[in-house]
UniProtKB/Swiss-Prot annotation:
Disulfide bonds: none annotated. This is ATP synthase subunit epsilon-like protein, mitochondrial. GO terms for cellular component: mitochondrial inner membrane; mitochondrion; proton-transporting ATP synthase complex. Pfam families: ATP-synt_Eps. GO terms for molecular function: hydrolase activity; proton-transporting ATP synthase activity, rotational mechanism. One of its GO terms (biological process) is proton motive force-driven ATP synthesis. It comes from Homo sapiens. Keywords: Acetylation, ATP synthesis, CF(1), Hydrogen ion transport, Hydrolase, Ion transport, Membrane, Mitochondrion, Mitochondrion inner membrane, Transport. It comes from the Eukaryota. F-type ATPases have 2 components, CF(1) - the catalytic core - and CF(0) - the membrane proton channel. CF(1) has five subunits: alpha(3), beta(3), gamma(1), delta(1), epsilon(1). CF(0) seems to have nine subunits: a, b, c, d, e, f, g, F6 and 8 (or A6L). It is found in: Mitochondrion inner membrane. Gene3D superfamilies: ATP synthase, F1 complex, epsilon subunit superfamily, mitochondrial. The keyword Nucleotide-binding does not apply. Mitochondrial membrane ATP synthase (F(1)F(0) ATP synthase or Complex V) produces ATP from ADP in the presence of a proton gradient across the membrane which is generated by electron transport complexes of the respiratory chain. F-type ATPases consist of two structural domains, F(1) - containing the extramembraneous catalytic core, and F(0) - containing the membrane proton channel, linked together by a central stalk and a peripheral stalk. During catalysis, ATP synthesis in the catalytic domain of F(1) is coupled via a rotary mechanism of the central stalk subunits to proton translocation.
């Protein structure tokens, strides 16, 4: 069984982005501001200093 997103020719990352946007768009107005604020990048890259 192949996942629907794979059959549509999408990567999982793109599929999850589309799903997140649909959920944010479906929110009530009072919750949209908080959702947009937290929808940014959630990955932080830190370079390790070598001693």
């Amino acid at each position: 069984m192949v996942a629907y997103w794979r059959q549509a020719g999408l990567s999982y990352i793109r599929y999850s982005q589309i799903c997140a946007k649909v959920v944010r768009d479906a929110l009530k107005t009072e919750f949209k501001a908080n959702a947009k604020k937290t929808s940014g990048n959630s990955v932080k890259i830190v370079k390790v200093k070598k001693e």
